[in-house]
Amino acid sequence: MVKLRLKRVGKKFHAQYKIVAADARSPRDGKFIEELGHYDPHAKKLTLNKELLTKYLDQGAKPTDTVRTLLKQEQFYSNYIASKK
């Protein structure tokens, strides 16, 4: 099963995260399928590749709770769900 989740990168005490599509069994910072965006919690900056996100969500990938919250803040997830109805 494919999950959309955060992969930690950056320096110690200054974490940044990549939003990736990864197998649910792989470790947090391990192998991933594709990078879909990145998030800097210190600068509150979120960058998304909306075409790739839509592709993986259409194929059945499940976002983790944190990624779902970030997508809702960008109004991406609610727009995606509304377009599916």
Curated annotation (Swiss-Prot):
Cross-referenced InterPro entries: Ribosomal_bS16, Ribosomal_bS16_CS, Ribosomal_bS16_dom_sf
Molecular-function GO term, any one: structural constituent of ribosome
Transmembrane segments: none
A Gene Ontology biological process term: translation
HAMAP family linked to this entry: Ribosomal_bS16
PANTHER family: 30S RIBOSOMAL PROTEIN S16 (PTHR12919), SMALL RIBOSOMAL SUBUNIT PROTEIN BS16M (PTHR12919:SF20)
Identification of the protein by name: Small ribosomal subunit protein bS16
Organism: Metamycoplasma arthritidis (strain 158L3-1)
